[in-house]
Amino acid sequence: MSHLPSSFDGAEQDVDEMTFLEKMTFHCKQQPLVPLGTLATTVAVILAAQNVRSGNKRKAQKYFRWRVGLQGATLVALVAGSFIYGTSQKERQSKEDALREKAKLREKLWIQELERRDEETQLRKKRAELARSRAKELEQETQGLQQELRDLQAKTSSSK
């Protein structure tokens, strides 16, 4: 687990880095009723303009009323979508924050485990060094005792 996954990794691109068409597609996917309302309002305005040109005042008035109603519906869809998207975005943000905190906790625990293992390794090295130095001391002591034994044997054999 040498690399912890980041909560920022993913295919989502920042809105500021998107092109115009990508932004338009992104926002249309967020609030699909707004583009439909805009399109319906545009159609109502075009039909009203055609009827004004042809002199049909009643149909022109009807389409202008449709335009006002569709514009109002589009605004309601925009406000409702913003409210819903804002709420879901806050929830998503809180989930992302929780994931970030969890990743930080994992990283902290991982670092603590590495430090603990490093301390164990250092302790083993110290023990091994102490054991080597103790073995060396014992070897020197053994050599000294052997020399002393030879000296004593030499004395006892020369005194006979």
From Swiss-Prot:
- Annotated region Disordered: the residues are 135-160
Name the predominant localization.
Answer: mitochondrion
Keywords, A to Z? Answer: Coiled coil, Membrane, Mitochondrion, Transmembrane, Transmembrane helix
Which residues does UniProt call coiled coil?
86-160
Question: What are the disulfide bonds?
Answer: none
Membrane topology qualifier: Multi-pass membrane protein
Q: Which Pfam families match?
A: HIG_1_N
What InterPro entries does the record tag this protein with? Answer: Hypoxia_induced_domain, RCF1
For biological process, the GO terms are: mitochondrial respirasome assembly
Residues annotated as domain HIG1 = 5-96
Q: Name where it's found.
A: Mitochondrion membrane
Q: Which GO terms describe its cellular component?
A: mitochondrial membrane
- Transmembrane ranges, per UniProt, are 33-50, 63-85
Tell me the function of this protein. Answer: Cytochrome c oxidase subunit which plays a role in assembly of respiratory supercomplexes.
Q: Which protein family is it in?
A: Belongs to the RCF1 family.
Record note on quaternary structure: Associates with the respiratory chain complex III/complex IV supercomplex.
Which PANTHER family does UniProt cross-reference here? Answer: HIG1 DOMAIN FAMILY MEMBER 1A, HYPOXIA-INDUCBILE GENE 1 HIG1 -RELATED
Name of the protein: Respiratory supercomplex factor 1, mitochondrial
Species the sequence originates in: Lachancea thermotolerans (strain ATCC 56472 / CBS 6340 / NRRL Y-8284) (Yeast)
Q: What is the lineage of its organism?
A: Eukaryota, Fungi, Dikarya, Ascomycota, Saccharomycotina
